[in-house]
């Protein structure tokens, strides 16, 4: 929602009335229209997409059980869906199309800022959890209790972080230049008076820059730098499959976050250094409009990156559409039948292969006895083959942990 800085020195208890003395420039009007169009697209595409992914993840958790990655993924999809649920009300309010009370504005503001904060924090937690999997030689899952405690603390921190929004969000009635009230121009805004700009507003913008911008970038970069060095020691097939997935994930995140962090840093500087005339107030609103889009774009691409591009999630989604995940017992029974059939086919194939191998060995032995020849060479695959097998045994730990990390990144 918009941030309004009013050139007064005290806060009135009544509903603030703001005179429209600063005309909306053409660039600001174009940016606000573009913001409304992009947000509408995100709502109609990202909302159903997050709902489908969240329902699929919840049903998969119910059927196959929970794990630390799936708990984090479920929390990420929930926060994104919650953000996109309140976004239509904020968009309509910004366009002066939805009158609201002060209580409803404060409620929507708290939900919006807390869900966005928890969403960014969950992305960092997922990166930290994947680092923990690759860094430890033996992968021991942390207890679900500690995972839930971490998420509860994250939500608590998100609610505390959104307290300035609860305090300073209000309804502002926009008046014309003649002081007369304009019908339908009552909007939900973050309202700050002049004395609060260099204390409350500046401090909050700096915190937004750190929590929403810098911290997730640092966590993601730190994890994937270690991830890249680990992938170099994996097999070529595993390396290619995992690097493709991780490269798309990291490039998409950094491509959004790098401009966002730059805009937020510049916005904090503008709040502290620029005067409060009409020109600079309009520029502040323009910068704020640009920075508001990035969290919404994350809500759109997160289900694509973490779910639809993840391992085995599309199969789970098809099973969800067919209703196979609704009955847990029937699903597990069908999985057991498929596993038993596969094991039977594998055993039959191994038996036929062993028979063919024994026949081939017998024929070779007969030929050797017939030739009466003696060889002092090592049999094929004894010393050299054993050395290669031992080397492979010691090097399978990294691909195994890498496979776990790639599988758990998708949360399924």
Curated annotation (Swiss-Prot):
One of its GO terms (molecular function) is G protein-coupled receptor activity. PROSITE patterns: G_PROTEIN_RECEP_F1_1 (PS00237), G_PROTEIN_RECEP_F1_2 (PS50262). Residues 377-412 are annotated as: Disordered. It is found in: Virion; Host cell membrane; Host cytoplasm. Heterodimerizes with US28. It is a multi-pass membrane protein. It comes from the Viruses. Disulfide bonds join 105-188. Its main location: virion. Residues 1-35, 102-106, 169-206, 266-292 are virion surface. The keyword Membrane applies. Belongs to the G-protein coupled receptor 1 family. PANTHER family: CELL ADHESION MOLECULE, G-PROTEIN COUPLED RECEPTORS FAMILY 1 PROFILE DOMAIN-CONTAINING PROTEIN. This is G-protein coupled receptor homolog UL33. The chain crosses the membrane at residues 36-56, 81-101, 107-127, 148-168, 207-227, 245-265, 293-313. Glycans are attached at residues 7, 19, 23. Residues 57-80, 128-147, 228-244, 314-412 are intravirion.
